[in-house]
Amino acid sequence: MAENERTFTAPQSLLDSNLTFLNDEPTPTTITLTRERCVDPSLINSFLRILRHGSDDVIRQKLNNYRKPSSISEKKCDAFLKQELYPNWQIRSSIISFCDQEATQMKAETDRKFSNTGSSATGTITDARIDPYAAREKLEDQEARYRDWTRVKEWVANNEKIEQILTSTTDRILRQNCEQNKNYLEQFAQFCKDNT
């Protein structure tokens, strides 16, 4: 089966010079996702950390200039939302969705490969007579595949929860600093529909 691959680039507004981490490593600005990266998400986690730092972690600082209620502040808030925050949230959501789709495919492929119906069950008996370790190797392969699937599903669930917490906290901060009566999470959902 052909490998799925998708590339994401961090929004330019996040790549400012004050974004440095310990170890002085260069900041990754682009990531190409594959199934292997979903199974071992260390690079994805680093990329998500950069995205989260550039928006949700520093939102109060970015909105400090917009505290006074006026039409100028509201326009600045809208510009910040549409040019920085919502694209950032959309990238993060797409990354998590990609790995979720890969997990679904992994489960379906593993279930298909190891179903005990038809000729594959007979083949296992024949293989067991020829190679006494074949059944054990098949079981180990099956367990490893399900372990990878479980790891990806847990990572997806974990990151969906993190995103839920971050977006609801950011929504609350936006209501305090921009427009109190707007539902920013609904606006984000509409932004995603308009930009897919």
At which residue positions do the language-model features occur?
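Non-coiled-coil alpha-helical tracts in long, low-complexity regions of eukaryotic assembly proteins
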Residues: 2-131, 140, 184, 189-196
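Charged, alpha-helical coiled-coil and adjacent rod-like segments in eukaryotic scaffold subunits
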Residues: 123-196
